[in-house]
């Protein structure tokens, strides 16, 4: 792996005029991004923040439920979101929000400033009001639309602000970008268990269970579904698992899970390859071969996962057609491998273009995005596909998109 480089200097030891302009432009973008996040956060906090759960939920209203035994990555409070529906069906949704796999990534949580400037930013480390818009009232979590086939379901959104795929159990000391000693609380597993206690208290006997997740939450689905069904909902027999975008190959996942996240042995011991998602899925199905319906979704040239892939391989937080092509080829292989361990798994493959053309690639996740309702070439939306699958009608969508020999986007 290459080492990270600093911006080049001119022969005189100072930045060139062009570099100075670039630095100033980045600073302006950073300030603008921070300002936009603050404005949106204040708006949510003052006018649109989900009410605190008071013990008497109104149907189809999202509530925040703080959990006293849980903690976000920066040590601040942790809450989940709950919604009561009109049925006995329950969706447990694992939120995404990046990953920290070493000291460098731990020191660079997501901020509006970093995103706007294109600076490395790897994971959300708290649940500030701004994060609400990523968690509820979009895609599968919409409540005010008849087009959502899950609108009548009960929901528990297990939020995520720990950078550990929901399985960490340790505290990690790192040096921040400004030189301060900080602690990243990898408490994802404890947050998960506290969330499940609340879920069982509110929704004790679901007739149907959908365990779903996007991005980092998609990795948690195979890691934690066995615990959910063994310990918390052992009597539910109608269970569907769905992961949206869980592909990031890295040769040191076992070391990260064991030594950085301090995850329990049950999570790091099955990790033998560079594909943590595949290893966790193989472990889950080897011990519970006929327990679940299994679903997976991805876009073909995911701009964000390819950025992370490039960072893992080359220590460059960027994406381009070459790394997107590599991501595509890895996706082709992963789909083959998933089908080999779960012949009945159904796939939803799409190629919706990323909304920032300069970066290229395809979008990252769809289940909690407007793309959830967008029709594919086969005239079916993810919403329809997922609803059918939860009722036992499994089908593949978009598999022809994986038949290219040379990938480009």
Language-model-detected regions and their locations in the chain:
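C-terminal His-loop and adjacent cap/lid subdomain of alpha/beta-hydrolase
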Residues: 2-409
């Amino acid at each position: 792996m290459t080492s990270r480089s600093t911006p080049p200097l001119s022969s005189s030891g100072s930045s060139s005029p062009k570099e100075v302009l670039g630095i100033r432009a980045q600073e302006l973008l950073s300030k603008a991004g921070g300002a936009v996040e603050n404005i949106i956060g204040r708006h949510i906090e003052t006018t649109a923040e989900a009410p605190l759960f008071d013990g008497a939920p109104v149907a189809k209203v999202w509530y925040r439920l703080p959990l006293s035994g849980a903690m976000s990555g920066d040590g601040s409070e942790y809450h989940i979101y709950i919604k009561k529906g009109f049925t006995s069906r329950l969706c447990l949704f694992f939120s995404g929000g990046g990953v920290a796999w070493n000291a460098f990534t731990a020191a660079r949580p997501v901020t509006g400033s970093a995103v706007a400037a294109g600076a490395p930013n790897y994971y959300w480390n708290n649940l500030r009001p701004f994060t609400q818009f990523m968690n509820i009232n979009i895609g599968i979590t919409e409540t005010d639309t008849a087009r959502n086939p899950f609108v009548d379901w009960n929901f528990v959104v297990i939020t995520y602000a720990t950078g550990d795929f929901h399985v960490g159990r340790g505290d990690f000391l790192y040096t921040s970008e400004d030189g301060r000693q900080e602690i990243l609380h990898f408490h994802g597993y404890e947050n998960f268990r506290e969330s499940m206690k609340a879920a069982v208290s509110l929704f004790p006997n679901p007739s149907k269970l959908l365990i779903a997740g996007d991005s980092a939450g998609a990795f948690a689905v195979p890691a934690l579904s066995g615990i959910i069904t063994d310990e918390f909902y052992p009597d539910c027999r109608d269970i569907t698992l769905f992961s949206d975008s869980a592909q990031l190959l890295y040769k040191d996942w076992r070391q990260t899970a064991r030594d950085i996240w301090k995850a329990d042995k049950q999570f790091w011991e099955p990790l033998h390859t560079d594909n943590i998602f595949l290893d966790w899925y193989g472990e889950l199905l080897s011990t519970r071969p006929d327990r679940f319906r299994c679903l997976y979704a991805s876009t073909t040239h995911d701009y964000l996962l390819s950025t992370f892939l490039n960072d893992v391989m080359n220590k460059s937080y960027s994406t381009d057609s070459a790394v997107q092509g590599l991501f595509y080829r890895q996706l082709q292989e992963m789909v083959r491998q998933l089908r080999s361990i779960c012949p009945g798994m159904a796939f939803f493959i799409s190629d919706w273009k990323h909304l920032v053309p300069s970066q290229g690639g395809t979008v990252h996740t769809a289940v909690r995005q407007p793309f959830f309702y967008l029709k594919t070439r086969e005239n079916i939306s993810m919403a329809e596909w997922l609803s059918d699958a939860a009722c036992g009608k499994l089908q593949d969508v978009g598999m022809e998109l994986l038949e290219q020999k040379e990938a480009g986007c």
